[in-house]
Amino acid sequence: MRDHGPMLSAYASSLSPEDPLSALTIGERPEPEPPDGWSKVRVRAASLNHHDLWSLRGVGLRAEQLPMILGCDAAGIDEQGREVIVHAIIGDPDWRGDETLDPRRSLLSERHQGTFAEHVVVPRRNLIQKPPQLSFEQAACLPTAWLTAYRMLFVRGHVTPGETVLVQGSSGGVATALIMLAHAAGARVWVTGRDPKKRERALALGAEQTFEPGARLPERVDAVMETVGAATWAHSVR
């Protein structure tokens, strides 16, 4: 991997609501230099999120911000040689409290260049020591999807062992994390999904039962984790 000069990146060079992949370019971009209080990370692994497709469609990204390197999540090696996970939310340095309420917060690749590159720069406070038992690839999948799932289950949902959790949607990063985290916490996990193979995979991840979308459930659940949207809202609140 090069130490200086242009770096290989995947970036939005245009915006296309109808054909987002046509707006994606793989090529060289200038290697970033960290401002004061920030650190450069040599990216060893980065993970995809649906956010990246939305960016290519122009959701949360304007033409005057282009080219924008995509990617919210990564794991790599910082300037001190530490193995780190990159936290994706860039907040106001003066904000105190729940960062999801910070009106000036953004995700990497919205205002600041993202992680789909050989290097990324972020505030030092955004770097978390990577657990040694996790590979770089595993660690890179954690920040956006798994933090979202954790917050849904335990911060907002207050799920406790023995409760029944319904996860609407059997695929996707957040749904996968919801199933595995809820199962690990001792909850009984039910999952809905259209695709039989994805429902089967949900069982392998820890779900106790799976159902067709909208199916009548054997009993009421304690918490519903909604990852689909309007198509399942009526079923979620029934």
Regions found by a protein language model. Give the residues of each.
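Short N-terminal binding/cap micro-motifs at the start of the first secondary-structure element
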Residues: S16-I26, D36, H50-D52
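NAD(P)H dinucleotide-binding glycine-rich loop of Rossmann-like/cofactor-binding domains
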Residues: H87-G169
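Glycine-rich beta-strand-centered segment in the early N-terminal region that forms part
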Residues: P30-S47, V59-R96, L108-G114, P131-Q133
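Conserved acidic residues
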Residues: R82, E118, E163, E208, ...
